Every structure is written in C-alpha cells, then in structure tokens.
C-alpha cells in the first residue's frame, strides 16, 4: 500500500476492475460517503488491499508502510457506521455485474437464485452485538456454537455465481448479547439488527423481492430441505418466480386422486420411470396451500436403497 493518493492504492490490474465495475459509484449510490476526513472510497480501497497484504489493520499500522495511513479508529468508524447501506451497495454492484455477464452468455441459459445458510462462528467472542448460541445443522458436526447463522442469496447461470444479499441471523431465545441501545432506530443498521432477530423464512421473501426489484433476471429459486416448506414456497411463488428444492419427509400433505398423503405415501403413488436409472418416480400433485407441484424421486447416491425427493412449482419441467 502506498501513500501517493487515491489512484495509487490498487495495482493496475485491480484498478481496472474497480473502474470497469464502477465500485466507487456504487458506494456513493448506497449513501456510503463522508463530508470530511479520508473519503469512503479511499478507506474502501485500503481495506480491499489488506487481502493481498495478508495483514489486518493493526499489523499494517505497525509496518513500515504505516506513514500517512488513517488510524484504526477511522477504519472502525467506517466499517461500523449504521448509516451506511452496505446491503444496497452489494445488491447494486452485483446487479450491475450480472448485466455485464448476461450480455456475454446465451440468453436461453436458465438463471436461478440460490438460497443457503451456513454457520458463522465467533466462539472466542464475548461482547459481539447480538451474539447467540446457535445449532449447526448445515454440516456433519451437528453441534452448538457461538456466533450467527449466515443466510445468503446468490445468482447463477450455471457457470457464474454472484452474491446478491446476506443476513446474519441471531436468536431471541438463545441470545447472549442484545442490540446496542445507542444505535439510531431510523438507520438501516438498526433495521438489519431487528432483521437478525427474526427467522430465515421471514427474511427470504424480502431478499428475493429486493433482488428482483433491482433488475436481476432469474426464473427459479433453488433451496435445500430446510427452506422447502409450503408457506415459504407460496410466498416466493406469489412474486412470480418458481421454486425448485429438496423435500424431506415431514407431515406436509399432498393431494393425489382426492386423497391427502405424506411424502412416503406419495412415493408409492408416483409413476415409475424407466428412462434413467437414477430417476425412480415422478408425480404431479397439489400442496395443502393449493399450489400445483411436480415431485421427482431420485436415487440417493450415498445409499442406493433410499430415495430423495425434489419438488418444482414449474410442472412443465422434465424429470432430468
């Protein structure tokens, strides 16, 4: 990192990327600006360069390159400001980048939104705001940890993946720390803190709505078994986008020949298929909330004697 001005903070190759993607413009559009001191664009580029330096800001200030750099308080104020709309910045940058990528790919290629969650561990932390005790269901560990659930929304065309939105989810029942009372309740930072105390199914429809409103083109939402629940499927379907997701055997009911059955009995009523050895059966049915779906049963690769179920609200799709 050099101290010769804003334009010299990045290597030429990275500076070209910043210019092409208009990153500083997206920062301004998200309200990430300052009226005095080091500019937000300058601070953002400094923090970005830390990735390639392999140091945190504390170590950078101890190095020989620290002359003329902002103090750590300036960096922390920049990162922690509740008035900066980082969600708008990420969505604006990603939507703009997706439009550039889409212009270079086949327009007939299906484009999807992908919902997933993972564990964001902070086991050594004690005073982190909204820190909670969470259960890790998304890995093989199946254990409790201190931290958050990281709910993410991404876009893909099968060859490119682009992050669109994310939410760090805490818990009202097992929270360790609460919301900082000094946060202005009118800011976007406070709204994200309130969102963190909600559930993933309540946050997902809003995330999808923001993505579609920003101009992101997608035909399907892909989800795993933790999110393929009938109320959430209905909320997404009402936004004009179809859902494809893995379904687990629960008490959810499906209508076949005027009979309501669970997933296991639905498998028995499904029509066997012979055109692919790993595709066992398929059936057209209706969920309890009135949405018609197609359920395809495939062979479990980890246990050939068992099956997995994939649900789609687009009944015109083939089994493949």
Feature map (PLM): residue ranges:
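Hydrophobic, Leu/Ile/Phe/Ala-enriched alpha-helical segments that form helix-helix packing faces
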Residues: 50, 97-101, 105, 208-215
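Gly/serine-rich nucleotide phosphate-binding loop at the start of the catalytic core
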Residues: 1-87
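Active-site-proximal, Lys/Arg-enriched surface segment
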Residues: 27, 81-173
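Short, charged/polar micro-motifs that form catalytic or ligand-binding hotspots
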Residues: 50-51, 65, 139-143, 194-197, ...
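Short low-polarity hydrophobic stretches
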Residues: 46, 60-61, 116, 153, ...
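Single, function-defining residue in the core of a domain
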Residues: 1-36, 44, 108-111, 126-127, ...
């Amino acid at each position: 990192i050099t101290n010769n001005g804003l334009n010299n903070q990045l290597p030429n190759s990275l500076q070209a990327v910043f210019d092409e993607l208009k990153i500083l413009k997206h920062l301004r559009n998200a309200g990430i600006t300052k009226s005095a001191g080091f500019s937000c664009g300058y601070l953002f580029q400094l923090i970005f360069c830390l990735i390639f330096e392999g140091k945190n800001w504390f170590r950078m200030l101890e190095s020989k390159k620290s002359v003329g750099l902002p103090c750590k308080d300036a960096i922390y104020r920049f990162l922690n400001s509740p008035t900066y709309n980082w969600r708008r910045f990420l969505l604006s940058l990603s939507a703009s980048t997706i439009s550039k990528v889409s212009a270079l790919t086949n327009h007939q290629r299906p484009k999807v939104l992908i919902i997933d969650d993972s564990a964001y561990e902070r086991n050594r932390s004690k005073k982190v705001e909204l820190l909670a005790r969470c259960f890790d269901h998304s890995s093989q560990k199946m254990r409790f940890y201190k931290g958050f659930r990281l709910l993410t929304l991404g876009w893909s065309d099968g060859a490119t993946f682009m992050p669109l939105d994310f939410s760090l989810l805490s818990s009202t029942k097992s929270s360790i720390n609460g919301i900082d009372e000094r946060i202005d309740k009118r800011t976007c930072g406070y709204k994200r803190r309130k969102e963190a105390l909600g559930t993933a199914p309540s946050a997902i429809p809003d995330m999808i709505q923001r993505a579609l409103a920003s101009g992101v083109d997608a035909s399907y939402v892909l989800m795993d078994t933790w999110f393929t629940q009938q109320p959430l499927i209905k909320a997404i379907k009402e936004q004009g986008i179809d859902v494809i997701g893995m379904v687990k055997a629960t008490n959810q009911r499906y209508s076949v020949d005027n009979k309501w059955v669970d997933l296991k009995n639905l498998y028995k009523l499904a029509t066997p298929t012979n055109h692919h050895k790993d595709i066992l059966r398929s059936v057209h049915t209706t969920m309890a909330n009135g949405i018609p779906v197609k359920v395809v049963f495939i062979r479990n690769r980890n246990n050939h004697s068992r099956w997995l179920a994939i649900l789609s609200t687009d009944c015109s799709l083939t089994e493949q």
